């Protein structure tokens, strides 16, 4: 399970006075840090009230997570797995959920296989593979429910997982209304660099998925959902081996090419979902190696810094 991204943690809600040495001093108690940074506004050089620490191995990062909540310089900070810049604009990338979508499941994959595989990231409460209500035919996708948010975050950091010899795609299961509202990470805007809104994922249970109705889980591609957008395995233009076949129409034509039918899941509206504009963290700066996932109207450190 060793993955360098799993060793990197995001720390939000820092005291504006917290320095990198102060941050390092606190988190070194849990292991060896290979990197530590407090993100600052490039113009004013003032802290944007969030930062990152990177441990030498996953076990040390896990120990820091397990010790939450953390208080640094008088502030109770929020600790979570850092999302890579590449992934930060994905719908729901910063959402706080316990439920993951798993796509690209072949017919020989059972729910027990999902539980066995994903248990390496934390306790799995259950797994389900979605089947057509009429025919009982598996539709090529399912969901995994974890006991806590960090386990889901860890599993989601690894975008593609090998299960039963097949590569499957994993994403956070974020309801469409939370993506549109920015509830997957959007907090209230703060211009003072303080806590602002913490963006707790829309304040609703993320585990209530509507599987029926007309349309697929269209944030997640042509996996279909009650009649629209069947899953076609990793082929271009609907090619490849199909789960759902012509009965479900629009095939999966590559990652990110998702059906646009009405459903309980939806495509990301510009500025929503916790990436870029509308994230929980930071101001408007897009400079430096930490731009992308934490810049733009967030709750930690507003645009005035």
Curated annotation (Swiss-Prot):
Principal location class: nucleus
GO molecular function: mRNA 3'-UTR AU-rich region binding; mRNA binding; protein kinase binding; RNA binding
Chain positions found as N6-acetyllysine: 133
Modified residues (Omega-N-methylarginine): 139, 284, 291
UniProt-listed Gene3D superfamilies: 3.30.70.330
Function summary: mRNA-binding component of ribonucleosomes. Specifically binds AU-rich element (ARE)-containing mRNAs. Involved in post-transcriptional regulation of cytokines mRNAs.
Domain RRM: 7-86, 98-175
Record keywords: Acetylation, Isopeptide bond, Methylation, Nucleus, Phosphoprotein, Repeat, Ribonucleoprotein, RNA-binding, Ubl conjugation
Species the sequence originates in: Homo sapiens (Human)
Name of the gene: HNRNPA0
Protein name as catalogued: Heterogeneous nuclear ribonucleoprotein A0
Residue list for modification Dimethylated arginine: 291
Processing after translation: Phosphorylated at Ser-84 by MAPKAPK2 in response to LPS treatment, promoting stabilization of GADD45A mRNA. Arg-291 is dimethylated, probably to asymmetric dimethylarginine.
Biased amino acid composition, Gly residues: 181-200, 269-281, 290-305
Entries under InterPro entries matching the protein: hnRNPA0_RRM1, Nucleotide-bd_a/b_plait_sf, RBD_domain_sf, RRM_dom
């Amino acid at each position: 399970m060793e993955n360098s991204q799993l060793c990197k943690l995001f720390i939000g809600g820092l005291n504006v006075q917290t320095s990198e040495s102060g941050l390092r001093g606190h988190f070194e108690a849990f292991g060896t840090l290979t990197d530590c940074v407090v993100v600052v506004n490039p113009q004013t050089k003032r802290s944007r009230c969030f930062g990152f620490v990177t441990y030498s191995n996953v076990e040390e990062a896990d120990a820091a997570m397990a010790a939450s909540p953390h208080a640094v310089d008088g502030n109770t900070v929020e600790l979570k797995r850092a999302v890579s810049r590449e992934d930060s604009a994905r719908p729901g990338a910063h959402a706080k959920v316990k439920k993951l979508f798993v796509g690209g499941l072949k017919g020989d994959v059972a729910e027990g296989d999902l539980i066995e595989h994903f248990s390496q990231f934390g306790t799995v409460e259950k797994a389900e593979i979605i089947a057509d209500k009429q025919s009982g035919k598996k539709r090529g996708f399912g969901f995994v429910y974890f006991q806590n948010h960090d386990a889901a975050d860890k599993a989601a950091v690894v975008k593609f997982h090998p299960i039963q010899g097949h590569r499957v795609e994993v994403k956070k299961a974020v309801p469409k209304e939370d993506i549109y509202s920015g509830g997957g990470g959007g907090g209230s805007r703060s211009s003072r660099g303080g806590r602002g809104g913490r963006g707790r994922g829309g304040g609703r249970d993320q585990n209530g998925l509507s599987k029926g109705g007309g349309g697929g889980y269209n944030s997640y591609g042509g996996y279909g959902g009650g009649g629209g957008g069947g899953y076609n395995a990793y082929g271009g233009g609907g090619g490849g081996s199909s789960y759902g076949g012509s009965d479900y129409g629009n095939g999966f034509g590559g990652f990110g090419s998702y059906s646009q039918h009405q459903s309980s899941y939806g495509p990301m509206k510009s500025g929503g979902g916790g990436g870029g504009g509308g994230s929980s963290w930071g101001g408007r700066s897009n400079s430096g190696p930490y731009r992308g996932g934490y810049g733009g109207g967030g709750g930690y450190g507003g645009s005035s810094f």
